Amino acid sequence: MKIDFIDSIEKITKEDWEAVLSSKYPFLKYEFLKALEVTNCVSPEQGWTPLHLIASENKTIMAIMPLYIKTDSQGEFIFDWSWADAYYRNGLNYYPKLVSSIPFTPASGPRILITDETRSREVIQEISKALKQITEESDFSSVHILLASRDEI
């Protein structure tokens, strides 16, 4: 399985993204996430840099995970400023961190979109390895999966 990280939703076709989206959850729709990007609502200047995860096998997309590099905690609806302060007091950087979330949306929902549920355990294991690797290589403090749906917890 190959894991790639893309810095814009436009690096994948709408058809490929929507083929993986099995629910009608509106905040994961290609058009919604693209609109956030093209209007610069999510951008490095806003503290939300897209870095979406794409898992594929034989050039077929198996899974997608919306991801963002966060340089602050604005727009997450997870109030972790005390965590950031604790990191700072101990000489550590809390930012940048890697976040799977829907920007500015305090609604729970799917965060890992998988095409073949019979392989979900395997896919999640590969995604976990890739997230650990990119966190270490890119010096992110941590990975956060925010407001995931109940069945993903």
Predicted regions and their residues:
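N-acyltransferase acceptor-side catalytic subdomain
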Residues: M1-I153
